[in-house]
């Protein structure tokens, strides 16, 4: 599985996960690329709950990604703490779709 990151994701992941935690996330997604729930109206963009440092999945991180099934690739789009926001706004979803050209 090939992982491609947006610049925003790269900036945020370095602040929210250490190398081992990020490797564990990538391993999980490589084994279970459909693990995240598809965000309605997103064209297939998924949201995965992920435990952050010292937190469980429910209060941890939200990983936003897109699984390119035919390309065996995952685009890592956005990452945020649940305490920052519950869900992506419709505008955020629209921008992510445009970035992927879906």
Question: Where are the regions a protein language model picked out?
Answer:
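Arg/Lys-rich, positively charged N-terminal/basic patches that mediate binding to nucleic acids
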Residues: 1-20
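Residues that recognize and position ribonucleotide moieties
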Residues: 2, 46, 86
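Sequence/structural signature of beta-propeller domains
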Residues: 8, 19-20, 24, 31, ...
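Short Gly/aromatic-enriched secondary-structure transition segments
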Residues: 13, 25-26
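A short, surface-exposed loop/turn module that caps and links secondary-structure elements
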Residues: 27-57
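Short polar/acidic secondary-structure junctions
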Residues: 53-55, 66-69
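Short, surface-exposed coil-to-beta transition loops
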Residues: 59-63
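Enriched for short, Lys/Arg-rich terminal
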Residues: 67-102
